[in-house]
Every structure is written in C-alpha cells, then in structure tokens.
C-alpha cells in the first residue's frame, strides 16, 4: 500500500494533513499518537471508508478509488475498535461473512474450500469451541476475536486494525498479536494497526509512525522511533526508556509526579544488624539496586539486603531461596548473598560530602555493600560496581576477593556534580574499608 499527500476529515474539517506512507508486503506498521491526533481518521482514509479531500491511496499498485467494493474486499480486511451486532448470528455465521466477497451464483452458497477457511480462521483465533453460540452472548473480548476471525476468513493481502487489543485480557492480546505477526512473517500479510500502548507496538511492529495534530512523522524502526525525546515531543509528558530483557525493542515507562516532601537520609549504620550467621539491613522505602548476588541479581528494587551463612550446597541459589522463604523474607524485594564462613567480622564506614553520604560495608569473602543516600543513574551503578571491583583488585591482587558486590541508592537528592562526588567517596571509602578488612580477616 502507498499513500501520497493524504488530507481529509469529516464535513468541512481537515483533520489529516498531507500524510504519506508506504506499507510493504509482510510488514506490520503501527500508528501511534495521543487522543485526537487523527489515528482513526487516517485509518478511515487509508481504507476508503472516508473519502480523502486531497491525495491518493494505492493498493497493490492500483488506485483505491478504482476498486469495486467486492474486489476490494478480496484483498483488504478491516477490524474496527468495536462492532455493534444488531442481529443474532452464531459465531460461525459471523466468521463466514468473511467469505462473502468470494461467493458467486444466485444463492451465494459456501464452497468446501470456503468452509475449510472459515474453520481454520476460527481455530486460529480460538473461537471454534463456541462456533454455534450467538455472538451477542459473548464478552467484548470474545467478540473481538470473532471479528478478527471474520477478517482472516477474507484471506486479505492487507489487514487494517483499530486498537485491536482494547477488549482483550493479556493472554488474548498476546495470542492475537502473535498470530498477526506470524501471518505477516509466513504468509506475507501486510498489517496496519492503530495502537495506544507504546510498548506493545514497539514489540510487535516492524515500523512505527507517530501522529500529532493531524500530521504524521516519518515511519521508523522501533529502535529509532521510541526514544525519550520523541515520546515527550509527541505526548508532552516525561517518560523513561528501558531496554527489554529479551528483545532489542525499547520499552517506555511513565514518570509519576515526584513526592514534594523531602525524604530524610536513611541511617544505614543504625539499621545494620549483624551476627555470626547473617548481616541484615532493611529499609521502609525501596532502594534501587545493582548486584551480582544470587538473589536479586542485576537491576532491581529492594527493601531487604542480607548476607546469610549457609553450608556449601549443590545448588546455592535453591538453598538460599528456601532458607529465606522459610524465614519469611519477600524474595521479590530482597537482595541476598551467602557464605559458608562466619559473618560477624566485617568493616563499615559512612563517608559524607554535604548532603550526600555513602555507607560502605566489607564482609566475609570481601563481599562489598555500597549504599548511597542520593540519586544515581543506571550507568553510574555500573561504574560504581566496576570501581569497587577495581579497588578490591588493587588492594588484594587478582583473585584476592571473590565475594558479591551490591550497589544501592535511595534515588533522592539530585545534586550538582553528583556522579563526580559520589565516585570520589566510593573509591576512597572502598579502598580504606578493604584494607582494614584485610587486616581484620588475617
């Protein structure tokens, strides 16, 4: 499909201004934008349900306006946001309407091939089990799946969808989009869909196009389209871009309004509890953490930091998990490490620079906790972990300390030159505490 200089709207209004785009065979294009930006209106112009005031749309190399309705229905299908069902047709009868453009003769009877296509479409969308049920008795999500089956029964070359997952629960959202993605990949189906959910569109679409005030930006791969700057420009709100764990597609999270009440620094030293078998620190507010610990590894948010003494086990993670669960700790908000040696010998200090403070604790095996009263960006966490490892190696030599390293921050008190100041505190404090711990452990 190709659209050139498309403009139009309802009545005398022009809601869409000079939009051009192309959709190739096998491509999944997502159209995004705030409410009232013109997404659905553009879809109506692309499908011909709303005549364009200016511009042209080509489908399979032919002007959209030159297609007869039946001819167009054989290559294009549309799944709107919601369809009102005025008649009590069964699910199978509703899906079978998708074969209407292919029926011939006076009585337009269904062929064996058509019946097989209808059955396949129902199975693909998970509605075959209630094929004889009246569609009006189904939930909104079930009806949406029936209408998708109807669209697939047309065996279109291009499929248009307007917020197709609106009435679906998470499992069926995934099933529907997995199916569409699979059809684009295996059957060459072209798909154009309006989305509200940025992350869903980023995960499934090959290209994204943002709209604002009736104009459209360029079509781009999600990796280039979904950035903090572009989202702020389109939606006029602050967001944070994240990296998906199993896909190169970027994810976006919104930023809630910050608490206007200034939080007090956490007295890490006062909260530290230690004995022969564990070192424990718990806070009321969650800490942003980066660690190499068996439980809570990588980036997470934790209220409980614990170093537990456990005998050597075949599966250390399983043993530590069982021990913590039996003790009533919430694993989803816990960073935990384990050692087989006694834990009541350790070194800790607090280092301060104005409103910033860093609590450093060096424990058995030269495990290191670095707890920051202040804000740290994700990249600084990584730098801090590397700096701690470098200082440990400098003092002890290669292989001198193999314990886990944990970095945590309250994520409050953003200050000028914060990274430089924190880095100085961490390097100085880590070196001093490791040297003192080395003497203690001897």
From Swiss-Prot:
| Amino-acid positions noted as binding ATP in the UniProt annotation, renumbered to this chain | 33-40
This entry's Gene Ontology molecular function terms read: ATP binding; ATP hydrolysis activity
> Which top-level group of life is the source organism from?
Bacteria
Which InterPro entries does the record match to this protein? AAA+_ATPase, ABC_transporter-like_ATP-bd, P-loop_NTPase
Q: Does the keyword Transcription regulation apply?
A: no
Protein keywords = ATP-binding, Nucleotide-binding, Translocase, Transport
Q: Which residues form the signal peptide?
A: none
Q: What class of enzyme is it?
A: translocase
Q: Per its UniProt record, what Pfam families does this chain match?
A: ABC_tran (PF00005)
Q: What is its EC number?
A: 7.-.-.-
Say if the entry is tagged with keyword Metal-binding.
no
User: Which residue ranges does the record assign to the ABC transporter domain?
Assistant: 1-238
Q: Which family does it belong to?
A: Belongs to the ABC transporter superfamily.
Q: What does this protein do?
A: Probably part of an ABC transporter complex. Probably responsible for energy coupling to the transport system.
Describe its assembly: The complex is composed of two ATP-binding proteins (YvrA), two transmembrane proteins (YvrB) and a solute-binding protein (YvrC).
> Per its record, how is this protein called by name?
Uncharacterized ABC transporter ATP-binding protein YvrA
Which source organism does the UniProt entry give? Bacillus subtilis (strain 168)
């Amino acid at each position: 499909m190709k659209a050139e200089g498309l403009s139009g709207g309802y009545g005398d209004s022009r809601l869409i201004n000079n939009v051009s785009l192309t959709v190739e065979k096998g491509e999944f294009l997502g159209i995004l934008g705030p409410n009232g930006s013109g997404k659905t209106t553009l879809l109506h112009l692309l499908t011909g349900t709303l005549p364009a005031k200016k511009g042209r749309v080509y489908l399979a190399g032919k002007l959209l306006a030159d297609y007869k309705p039946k001819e167009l229905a054989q290559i294009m299908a549309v799944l709107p946001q919601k369809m009102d069902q005025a008649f009590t047709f069964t699910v199978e009868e509703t899906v079978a309407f998708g074969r209407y453009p292919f029926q011939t003769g006076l009585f337009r009877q269904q062929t064996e091939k058509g019946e097989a296509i209808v059955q396949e479409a129902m199975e693909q969308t998970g509605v075959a089990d209630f094929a004889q049920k009246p569609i009006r008795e189904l939930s909104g999500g079930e009806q949406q799946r029936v209408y998708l089956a109807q669209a697939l029964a047309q065996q279109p070359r291009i499929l248009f969808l307007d917020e197709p997952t609106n009435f679906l629960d998470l499992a069926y959202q995934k099933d529907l989009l997995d199916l569409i993605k699979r059809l684009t990949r295996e059957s060459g189906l072209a798909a154009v869909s309006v989305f509200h959910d940025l992350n869903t569109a980023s995960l499934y679409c090959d290209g994204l196009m943002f709209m604002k005030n009736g104009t459209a930006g360029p079509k781009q791969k999600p990796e280039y389209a979904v950035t903090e700057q572009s989202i702020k420009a389109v939606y006029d709100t602050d967001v944070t871009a994240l990296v998906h764990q199993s896909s190169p597609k970027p994810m976006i999270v919104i930023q809630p309004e910050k608490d206007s009440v200034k939080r007090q620094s956490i007295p890490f030293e006062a909260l530290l509890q230690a004995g022969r078998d564990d070192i424990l620190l718990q806070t009321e507010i969650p800490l942003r953490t980066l660690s190499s610990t068996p439980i809570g590894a990588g980036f997470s948010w934790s209220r409980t930091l614990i170093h537990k003494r456990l005998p050597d086990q075949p599966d250390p993670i399983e043993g530590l998990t069982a021990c913590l669960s039996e003790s009533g700790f919430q694993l989803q908000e816990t960073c935990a490490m384990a050692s087989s040696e006694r834990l009541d010998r350790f070194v800790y200090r607090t280092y301060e620079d104005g409103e910033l403070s860093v609590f450093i604790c060096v424990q058995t095996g030269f495990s290191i906790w670095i707890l920051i009263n202040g804000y740290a960006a994700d990249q600084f966490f990584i730098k801090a972990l590397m700096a701690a490892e470098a200082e440990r190696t400098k003092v002890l030599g290669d292989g001198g300390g193999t314990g886990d390293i944990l970095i945590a921050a309250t994520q409050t008190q953003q200050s000028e030159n914060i990274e430089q100041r924190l880095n100085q505190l961490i390097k100085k404090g880590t070196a001093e505490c490791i040297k003192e711990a080395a003497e203690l452990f001897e």
